[in-house]
Amino acid sequence: MKTTAQIRQSYLDFFHSKGHQVVESSSLVPHNDPTLLFTNAGMNQFKDVFLGMDKRPYTRATTAQRCVRAGGKHNDLENVGYTARHHTFFEMLGNFSFGDYFKHDAIAYGWEFLTSPQWLGLPKEKLYVTVYETDDEAYDIWNKEVGVPADHIIRIGDNKGAPYASDNFWAMGDTGPCGPCTEIFYDHGEHIWGGLPGTPEEDGDRYIEIWNIVFMQFNRHADGTMEKLPKPSVDTGMGLERIAAVLQHVNSNYDIDIFQTLIKKVAQLTGEKDLTNKSLRVIADHIRSCAYLIADGVMPSNEGRGYVLRRIIRRAVRHGHLLGAKETFFYKLVPTLADVMEHAGEIVNQKRALIEKTLKAEEEQFARTLERGLLLLDDALSQVKDNVLSGDVAFKLYDTYGFPLDLTADVCRERNITIDEKGFEREMQAQRARAQASSNFGVDYNNVIKVDGQTEFKGYETTSLSSAKVVALFTDGKSVERVQSGENAVVILDRTPFYGESGGQIGDTGYIATDLAAFRINDTQKYGQVTGHIGQLESGSLSVGDTVSAQVDTERRLAVAANHSATHLLHAALRKVLGDHVAQKGSLVSESALRFDFIQPEAISKEQIIEIEAIVNRQIRENISVTTEVMDIEAAKQKGAMALFGEKYGDLVRVVGMTGFSIELCGGTHVKRTGDIGLFKVVSESAIAAGIRRIEAVTAENAINWLNNQQNILNQSADLLKSDTASLVEKIQQLQDKAKKAEKELQQLKEKAAMQAGSDLAKSAVKINDISVIVQQLDGIETKSLRVMVDDLKNQLGSGVIVFASVVEDKVNLIVGVTADLTGKVKAGELVNLMAQQVGGKGGGRPDMAMAGGSQPENVGAALSACSDWLESNL
């Protein structure tokens, strides 16, 4: 029996033997494709090739593509664990032809791989195929050339309510490449319910689609007409987990080797004995998507891809809770996953430390609110009417306890309860409206500037040009032929020394001029293939066709270059100190400072910051040569050049190196030697999102100015404390010691006063059914003193209930004390929470002592009344 890893390798080997280039799986984060949340099909990385916008050095390719379907249009999350074949993560085996072979070879290859004893050796009688109703060519190839009998070939027409809307007709969109497809199904046997494609029972599990072969042969126009493509192409997909189930003689994907290994590990970690428990399936599936998403640079957050990852992690943690997991367990599955995925697990092994740290931190964070959220949900579900949970409760769970809607839906599903999703969405929209700040945006020239040709960038060699031609002018969002003095405009030149903002580096400033005109450039931006010089005409007039000189603000450019080169040194130093998991997530390089965002799941210590600074400054002092070289991207990767995550690179790339220390793909401007940076100083380090840290730093003169400013602060502080700077720490320590001593003495006085007040309050106790009760408002008394008073009164009363409320600086403090003999009747935690609800707060504690806080002092009277009423009714 073939393992899943062996099937994956067999597929790639087969198509390599047929002249296909084996291409590595692309990232789960699509490159520059805003239409996709995650890579969800093998063809995603070849989309531009199919559209004719990109060319590859090969016309045949094969891949084992990792895919995620959770969130967005393709969202399988809610079904995962409850069906045999839904997953958040799966591998798609694919072979592709870019204007090379077509239907005959695509069908022949598929049949050979599936049925040949040399490869998979499936029984031919177990296979059925579908073709598009009018695709006689594909039908004849299957029937007459391959030899599939007619009763095993099914024609599928337009079954989705519109022309060409069919399970067997594929389209990239409303317009563009499209064509019929043929699908191959496997018959699991008559002991399993289900019917053939096209029958009412087709959704059963007997006949399972294992391969889809798409024939891209038409270009659909906006009017619906179909034009034949000059070079038709082929896109295929076969789910690895599905074909593994077939070859391993199981009906459910969760019974294949990969999942069974993971399921057994989950059971071991959680103590679950029943290996058919659906929660085991959920967790085994979710560790795959979570680990690979983190490996591909996604970190848990509250928006976009990061929020989908957070939802998956929290769903897995909740199912672990159902299984009885008492401690963090999810991250412990990573080594097992890396092993069982074999070659496809290499990226998980490389990023293992980052994945484990991220998952553990996220699980610990969610565990703090999971229990309370589940109690709230359980209480709400016990009061549900008509089997519908209200949208506002679902939203409160989301907003307060971090419960994604699908996690709440999971719990409801187990009790046959649905959620009022419209009500949830109303609450969500109301929150968005409250949070939305008013914005006033200018003209978006990205949608305005359409210019033939491109701007040639000369800024690597020079910061000035004596001659450049104005090819277009834009003002107020419109193309114009001429601009006059005082007008703001965007100037497009045929060539320029000005760097357009990209890669985190801000755009250049400066001037362009003629003999009679001067245009001040305040910013430079890239608009597709052209560069826009944004600014104001200070004198004269400027027309399309004019010849101008161009001069960059050289001093500013050099300051920007110093910060950009320092960013590369910082990146390399971070990886040396923190580890290879560090990867850039964003940057800003200006003339005054640099900002660098990077993956790092833990806080960075002060000692590590000092070490990072020292490494960067050592490289600056060594005055290393900074080199730039244009080369083939594969050669750059072999040299170890780091690429910016999420960027899409062409076949030729620019490599910036700092001999023996840093090498990165980069299109920015840099110093000639590291000594030109002068000095590097970190001014701040912080977290900006879960697993993402930010360092801000200054260089050269800005670093000296920053240090001088810090020295001034030290000098002023020393003067105020009548000390010198060398003795400043000692002086502050002495003052702190004095302050602590005075604070301790003050607290002792307060406690003495509180005990005296407690003696007086004991006399005010009332009896409820022979039980002593004190309910009082004591404003201005802090929590610590209240606790002393309660303990003293419990001793004095011997048996009783003491309740105090105090308002200090508009904050409400509540405390309830119950003597040990009464905790069976009165739970301090329940009573304090009853009061806390009245003052907009929450609290907790032991049965004999509990505390709460609140933000609504005007409701303290109501809280005490509610407490008294409860005691009257329950004692």
UniProtKB/Swiss-Prot annotation:
Which PROSITE patterns does the entry mention?
AA_TRNA_LIGASE_II_ALA (PS50860)
Keyword Aminoacyl-tRNA synthetase assigned to the entry: answer is yes
Provide the protein's localization: Cytoplasm
| CC cofactor | Zn(2+)
Report the SUPFAM superfamilies cross-referenced here. Class II aaRS and biotin synthetases, Putative anticodon-binding domain of alanyl-tRNA synthetase (AlaRS), ThrRS/AlaRS common domain, Translation proteins
Q: Which residues participate in Zn(2+) binding?
A: 564, 568, 666, 670
Enumerate the catalysed reactions: tRNA(Ala) + L-alanine + ATP = L-alanyl-tRNA(Ala) + AMP + diphosphate
What is the predominant subcellular site recorded for this chain? cytoplasm
Q: What class of enzyme is it?
A: ligase
Cofactor binding mode and count: Binds 1 zinc ion per subunit.
Q: What is its EC number?
A: 6.1.1.7
What family does the database annotate? Answer: Belongs to the class-II aminoacyl-tRNA synthetase family.
The protein, known as: Alanine--tRNA ligase
Species this chain originates from? Mannheimia succiniciproducens (strain KCTC 0769BP / MBEL55E)
| Gene name tied to this protein | alaS
